[in-house]
A protein has these predicted regions:
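Cytoplasmic juxtamembrane interface segments
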Residues: 1-7, 76-89, 147-170
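Aromatic- and glycine-rich beta-strand/loop motifs that create alpha-glucan
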Residues: 1-26
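Membrane-helix interface segments
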Residues: 17-19, 82, 94-96, 100, ...
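Pore- or pathway-lining transmembrane helices of multi-pass membrane proteins that form conduits
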Residues: 21-26, 164-182
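Secretory targeting signals
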Residues: 26-68, 100-164, 204-207, 213-219
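Terminal transmembrane helical anchor/hairpin motif
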Residues: 35-52, 171-244
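Helix-loop-helix units of permease transmembrane domains in multi-pass membrane transporters
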Residues: 75-107
């Protein structure tokens, strides 16, 4: 049943307007990051690492939360129309399978987005910044860590989009979560807030590894928030009053 749900969610993406955002926002982030790097070469002297911080800081703080929030709101949009929610609750499909299917689809989109961001990073580094060689192997590791941290954000946004029928409000809350995440991280409490995890994983504001010696705690926090969001979704779906 879960596989059928995933296939159904994937069909929603065919000719979807969210693909325009998928391409535009990472390109805007890359343009801004590259421009900022080239304008501050006297300060940003750490080559690929410095360019990485400029490319990923605003991406992880603004662009990615906005994209994930939009992905989640778009996938729940059909269920919130008319009496569709009542039909879903009466169907033989386990409600949590529906949530898990949406999670799988948004996670796939996040993986594609991260891959596109990294491709733009390498392209800008070679063509515009003219950096020597290839990016250090630690940078793809940062990307994978960021994807792990992103899973908590995805689950949180799917819960918000599930309980809030408005399309815009969950997106606003996602942006707010990303902004508060940078402040919480700066105070040293990033592992306690799901919207900080992706920023920490991407190492988006420092050249030095911010998670050195804390990989276990980071992974635990990501999995804990992910499990908490799935548990919350399960409880809400069991009550069958999300539409209200």
């Amino acid at each position: 049943m879960l596989k059928r749900c995933i296939l159904a969610e994937n069909r929603k993406l065919h000719a979807s307007p969210i693909w325009a955002m998928f391409f535009v926002l990472p390109i805007l982030s890359a343009v801004y990051g590259t421009f900022n790097y080239l304008q501050n070469l006297e300060i940003l002297t750490d080559g690929w690492y410095s360019l990485w911080t400029q490319h990923t800081l605003f991406y992880s703080m603004f662009f990615f939360p906005a994209m994930v929030s939009t992905y989640a709101a778009y996938l729940w949009r059909l269920e919130h129309l008319g009496h569709n929610w009542n039909l879903i609750m009466a169907s033989p499909v386990p409600p949590l399978d529906l949530f898990a299917a949406k999670f799988a689809v948004v996670a796939k989109l996040a993986l594609l987005t991260h891959s596109f961001v990294f491709a733009l990073f390498v392209f800008c580094g070679k063509v515009f910044a003219q950096l020597p060689g290839l990016p250090p192997v630690t940078l793809p590791l940062f990307l994978l860590r960021g994807l792990l941290g992103a899973l908590a954000v995805i689950a949180a946004q799917l819960v918000l989009a599930m309980v809030i029928r408005s399309f815009a409000v969950p997106i606003f809350l996602g942006l707010l979560g990303g902004i508060t995440g940078i402040f919480i991280s700066s105070k040293g409490f990033g592992l306690l807030w799901p919207y900080s995890l992706m920023q920490l994983g991407m190492n988006s504001n420092k050249s030095a590894d911010t998670l050195a010696g804390s990989y276990g705690l980071f992974a635990f926090s990501c999995l804990l928030w992910l499990a908490a969001m799935f548990a919350l979704a399960w409880l809400l779906l069991r009550r069958q009053d999300v539409r209200a």
